Amino acid sequence: MSKLRGYRVMLGLTQQQMADKLKISLQSYNNKETKKTPFNDKERLAIKSMVAEIKPDITIDELFYS
């Protein structure tokens, strides 16, 4: 399980719900979560804000690059 998927599950969100929050399609979100395509900066910041609710000290590097 990817780190991002783990945090999404801890937030109690489905891929569809994450896609809706980011205003992208489910297919696009799936491709990004599985690292087939990259998230853009706006999406990275939005995801960081969501994850910060459960892990306030999370960094973008930790979420997307480790």
Over which residues does each language-model region extend?
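Key DNA-contacting residues within the recognition helix of helix-turn-helix
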Residues: 5, 30-31, 48
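Residues within the helices of the helix-turn-helix
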Residues: 5, 16, 61
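DNA major-groove recognition helix of helix-turn-helix/homeodomain DNA-binding modules
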Residues: 42-58
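A short, Lys/Arg-rich alpha-helix, primarily the initiator
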Residues: 1-10, 58
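Residue-level detection of the helix-turn-helix DNA-binding "recognition helix"
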Residues: 6-9, 23, 34-36, 52
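Short alpha-helical DNA-recognition segment
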Residues: 12-31
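Short amphipathic recognition helices of helix-turn-helix/homeodomain-type DNA-binding modules
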Residues: 60-66
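The alpha-helix within a helix-turn-helix
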Residues: 8, 19, 48
